[in-house]
Amino acid sequence: MNKQTAHYHLPGLFEFYELYRMFLPLFREHREYFYDWCDIGSIYGAPPDCIWGGGRVSLEDHDAGEVLALLQEYGISARLTFSNSKLIEEHLSDRKCNELCALFAENTEPKNGVIVHSELLLQYLKSHYPQLYLISSTTKVLTDFEALKKETDREDFRYVVPDFRLNKAYEKLNTLTESQKDKVEFLCNECCYFGCKDRKECYEAVSRRNLGEEPDFSCTSPGAEEGYRFSKVMKNPGFISVGDIQKIYLPMGFSNYKIEGRGLGSALVLEFLLYYMTKPEYQLSLIHISEPTRRVVIS
């Protein structure tokens, strides 16, 4: 794997199918509009009503067969976000989640994966769907560097997404071995308050909602009521900019970068695609979304 290439892992596999249906041909046919040092490593997500789901509650859906066909056409790995941390044995027989895994396991090139939190689910997936690679979810909130190292040493995982508050621990990160660095996948654009003490509880609440429960949890972080604003996220101490990727992380030997946004609108996700992948001279004039058709057009 070329260490000078940034592999982006993008949000909204099901949620933003129409956006990617228009964007991916553009990315292939007009590659000169985009940075030559990056590509798309995967697109992740899950349809609504998946009890194995976690991280975010999915609201948008699209036919799984069409989703997979699109990504296979462009040689991009698809990832199911099955990071529910509250699963018990009886949940493992869920028909919808198993059918999705079976469908995703059919692809051999590129292989598809599953983002996972639960150890119970991890062992189940290894046993029943060994064709799928596994990613350790950021919902584990790995803020301790030694815990991150141990996670990267596990053969179970191809990638590990640490908590965003380890993003700027440069000295510690640089002590990782090459094989450990190959597994680290940084979450670049997290909006969560850097000093949040309830991040794990927040993710657990999402897991419970996906199981049909109504957890008693509300975010009390400063500015939470404002919603997601990319301009504000850029000021977060854990934010990883395009310049950071080029000048710091790639030279250090890190290649994988996750962009969050499953619970956001397609316009915001498009903004991320422009910022992280598109050359500045094209960012304002190259692509825009025409509502309500959501067509990606060249202007």
Regions found by a protein language model. Give the residues of each.
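Short active-site oxyanion
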Residues: 5, 109-114, 158-159
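Acidic/glycine-enriched edge-of-secondary-structure segments
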Residues: 6-10, 47-56, 220-237
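Active-site beta->alpha loop and helix N-cap motifs at the rims of alpha/beta catalytic domains
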Residues: 10-31, 38-129, 133-148
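Alpha-helix-loop-beta-strand connector modules within alpha/beta enzyme cores
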Residues: 63-76, 179-184, 188, 279-285
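C-terminal helical cap(s) of enzyme catalytic domains, especially alpha/beta-barrels
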Residues: 267-285
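Single conserved hydrophobic/aromatic residue that forms the stacking wall/gate
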Residues: 287-299
